[in-house]
């Protein structure tokens, strides 16, 4: 297990809290507050318990160079609004400016330090930079699971030099992931969709050793269909990965993991919304058409696999969900998962950028057991890779 805020005495302590503020911006305004909302419980609890709360975060990819566009000062207003608490700001995360701002804090105050990536030492996990950050703290709390796969100074380095704890968002994520794949109720079904097999090879290899059934959808399903000798017409397909797809299917047989591929497909002749479309069996896709979604027989097949499951892990859409009506399979299956979850019959964990967008589109994002907003870290966890900044929090 890992250390949480329950294990920490924070009264009058300077607590460095690593958070995720990599929020979408347009014209200097934050356009989506989801990530800010996720960190409220940790900051509010620390402030309530009388800690001096010092927030560390990165924004964008400034590569060690300070700039106005990547400054965290733009986030101060929305952050204090969501927190319902005033937030002080320091124009640097180390050195005199940071020290002066920290020294001025009273118990319960909240201070945001400037972008950690304005210093090259952040991404290099440079020991001198770690010490410069640590100089302003007595304890360290990591609440940024989305950066857990990066061993940077503020995500991993600090945990070696200060007493380290998981924040509430980090804790919720780790507990949900443990239920999803770490120690899940069986049978477990995974849905993996999206465009390309090439970006999900490690994921597929890991999942077939851990799950009882694997649903493959989206563009990547075409590569598997082609590998089985079927003609996928002009569909998005990585023909050069046919032998890899066959290896994955063979490995799944030995690990007793059922692979579920589409049996029918909705095809169109143009990659556009509302283009004329028709449903065909996957063995009779016209040579001049492209597969844009899974058909009704396929979604029924997936729904029945979900009915047999106790746990479901989802990464990636089942079709070109951003183009109607090719969002049908994704929406239908997502709503079925939501229904089973609400009935208490399924633990459902979803994550990854496109997945969150697709589940939002289906209107079910609040009905899953847990939705990870982490992207890369969620994928690496699904791939079974170690997460450096989580490992250092273990008791």
Swiss-Prot record:
Q: Which GO terms describe its biological process?
A: gluconeogenesis; glycolytic process
* Any one Gene Ontology cellular component term annotated for this protein: cytosol
Q: Give the transmembrane region(s).
A: none
Q: Which UniProt keywords apply?
A: ATP-binding, Cytoplasm, Glycolysis, Kinase, Nucleotide-binding, Transferase
SUPFAM superfamilies reported for this sequence: Phosphoglycerate kinase
Q: Which residues bind ATP?
A: 200, 322, 352-355
The residues the entry assigns to the signal sequence are none
Instruction: Give the multimer and partner information.
Output: Monomer.
**HAMAP family, A to Z:** Phosphoglyc_kinase (MF_00145)
What family is reported?
Belongs to the phosphoglycerate kinase family.
- The molecule here is called Phosphoglycerate kinase
Q: Which organism is the protein's source?
A: Brucella suis biovar 1 (strain 1330)
Gene name, per UniProt, is pgk
């Amino acid at each position: 297990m890992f250390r949480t805020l329950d294990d920490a005495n924070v009264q009058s302590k300077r607590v460095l809290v690593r958070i995720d503020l990599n929020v979408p911006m347009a014209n200097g305004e934050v356009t989506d507050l989801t990530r800010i909302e996720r960190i409220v419980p940790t900051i509010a609890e620390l402030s309530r318990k009388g800690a001096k709360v010092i927030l560390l975060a990165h924004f964008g990819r400034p590569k060690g160079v300070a700039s106005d566009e990547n400054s965290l000062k733009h986030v101060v207003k929305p952050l204090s609004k969501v927190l319902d608490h005033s937030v002080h700001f320091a124009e640097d995360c180390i050195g005199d400016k940071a020290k002066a701002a920290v020294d001025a804090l009273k118990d319960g105050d909240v201070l945001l330090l400037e972008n950690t990536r304005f210093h090259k030492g952040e991404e290099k996990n440079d020991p001198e930079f770690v010490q410069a950050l640590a100089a302003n703290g007595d304890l360290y709390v990591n609440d940024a699971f989305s950066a857990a796969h990066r061993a940077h100074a503020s995500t991993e380095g600090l945990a070696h030099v200060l007493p380290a704890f998981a924040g509430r968002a980090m804790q919720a994520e780790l507990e949900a992931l443990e239920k999803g794949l770490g120690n899940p109720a069986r049978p477990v079904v995974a849905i993996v969709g999206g465009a390309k097999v090439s970006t999900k090879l490690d994921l597929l290899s890991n999942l077939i050793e851990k799950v009882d059934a694997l649903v493959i959808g989206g563009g990547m399903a075409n590569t598997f269909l082609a590998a089985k000798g079927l003609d996928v017409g002009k569909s998005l397909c990585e023909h050069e990965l046919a032998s890899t797809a066959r290896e994955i299917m063979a490995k799944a047989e030995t690990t007793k993991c059922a692979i579920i591929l589409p049996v029918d497909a909705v095809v169109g002749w143009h990659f556009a919304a509302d283009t004329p479309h028709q449903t065909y069996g996957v063995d009779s896709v016209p040579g001049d058409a492209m597969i844009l979604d899974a058909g009704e027989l396929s979604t029924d097949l997936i729904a029945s696999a979900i009915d047999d499951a106790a746990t479901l892990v989802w990464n990636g859409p089942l079709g070109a969900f951003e183009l109607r009506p090719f969002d049908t399979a994704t929406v239908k299956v997502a709503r079925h998962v939501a229904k089973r979850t609400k009935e208490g019959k399924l633990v459902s964990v979803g994550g990854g950028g496109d997945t969150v967008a697709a589940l939002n589109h289906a209107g079910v994002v609040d009905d899953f057991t847990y939705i990870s907003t982490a992207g890369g870290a969620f994928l690496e966890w699904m791939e079974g890779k170690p997460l450096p900044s989580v490992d250092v929090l273990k008791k």
